[in-house]
């Protein structure tokens, strides 16, 4: 006779993936804050390219279906949702270049881009939900940092999609200027292909020289300004 699975078996208690919803936004609204923006960034980890932040205020009556953490979506689905978000929500985008990242650090550059995205919204936010551990300093409204926020809040999820698609498009344009690095394929992350290009050519002006793998590498081809801050 096959033994029964004990009640505390991991088979019976597998983690259920989080699905973002509108509860955090409604909680803020109940506290008197409206509209509520979600904010997130893309590109903290790559060796090259900007970090891009987005802020999104969703229309509660026109929330696109299928919003989720951008990392959980295919590139095609991100593109589809990107178009829907721009058509139905208030959106603002800002970036910090690799130069800004090297001058400060990736955390400060990310928060600065997020602050500029939030402050540039056509409709000022009364409250902000951000992904991660920090709310950017210098905002004109209160906010809440939400760990795994892009899996909990549809507004943050929307911002994560906008930031990711925008940055991927920037790196696709960079590929036309510096084709030998393969930016279109890895969007700046430290893949074997990317590291081989750096070893062969040296870094270009999009590389983050403050990042450990690049600190002792000689300069390669340069470009004045592909991506402005």
From Swiss-Prot:
It is found in: Cytoplasm. InterPro entries: RNase_HII, RNase_HII/HIII, RNase_HII/HIII_dom, RNaseH-like_sf, RNaseH_sf. It catalyses: Endonucleolytic cleavage to 5'-phosphomonoester. The keyword Manganese applies. Its EC number is 3.1.26.4. Keywords: Cytoplasm, Endonuclease, Hydrolase, Manganese, Metal-binding, Nuclease. CDD domains: RNase_HII_bacteria_HII_like. GO terms for cellular component: cytoplasm; ribonuclease H2 complex. Its cofactor is Mn(2+); Mg(2+). It is an enzyme of class 3 (hydrolase). Its main location: cytoplasm. Manganese or magnesium. Binds 1 divalent metal ion per monomer in the absence of substrate. May bind a second metal ion after substrate binding. GO terms for molecular function: manganese ion binding; RNA binding; RNA-DNA hybrid ribonuclease activity. It comes from the Bacteria. A divalent metal cation binds at residues 40-41, 131. Pfam families: RNase_HII. GO terms for biological process: DNA replication, removal of RNA primer; mismatch repair. Residues 34-223 form the RNase H type-2 domain. Endonuclease that specifically degrades the RNA of RNA-DNA hybrids. Belongs to the RNase HII family. This is Ribonuclease HII. It comes from Rhizobium leguminosarum bv. trifolii (strain WSM2304). The gene is rnhB.
């Amino acid at each position: 006779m096959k033994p029964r699975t004990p009640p505390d078996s991991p088979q019976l208690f597998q983690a259920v993936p989080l699905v973002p919803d509108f509860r955090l936004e409604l909680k803020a609204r109940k506290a008197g804050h409206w509209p509520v923006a979600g904010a997130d960034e893309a590109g903290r980890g790559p060796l090259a390219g900007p970090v891009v932040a987005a802020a999104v205020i969703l229309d509660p009556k026109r929330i696109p279906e299928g919003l989720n953490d951008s990392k959980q979506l295919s590139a095609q689905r991100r593109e589809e949702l990107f178009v829907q978000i721009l058509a139905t929500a208030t959106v603002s985008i800002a970036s910090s270049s690799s130069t800004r990242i090297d001058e400060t650090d990736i955390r400060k550059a990310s928060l600065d881009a997020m602050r500029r995205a939030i402050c540039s919204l056509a409709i000022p936010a009364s409250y902000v939900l951000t992904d991660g551990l920090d709310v950017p300093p210098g905002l004109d409204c209160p906010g809440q940092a939400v760990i795994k926020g892009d899996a909990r809040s549809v507004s943050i999820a929307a911002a994560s999609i906008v930031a990711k698609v925008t940055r991927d498009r920037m790196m696709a344009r960079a590929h036309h200027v510096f084709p030998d690095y393969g930016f279109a394929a890895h969007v700046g992350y430290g893949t074997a292909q990317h590291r081989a290009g750096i070893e062969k050519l040296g870094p270009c002006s999009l590389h983050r020289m403050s990042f450990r793998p690049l600190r002792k590498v000689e300069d390669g081809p340069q470009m004045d300004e592909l991506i402005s801050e």
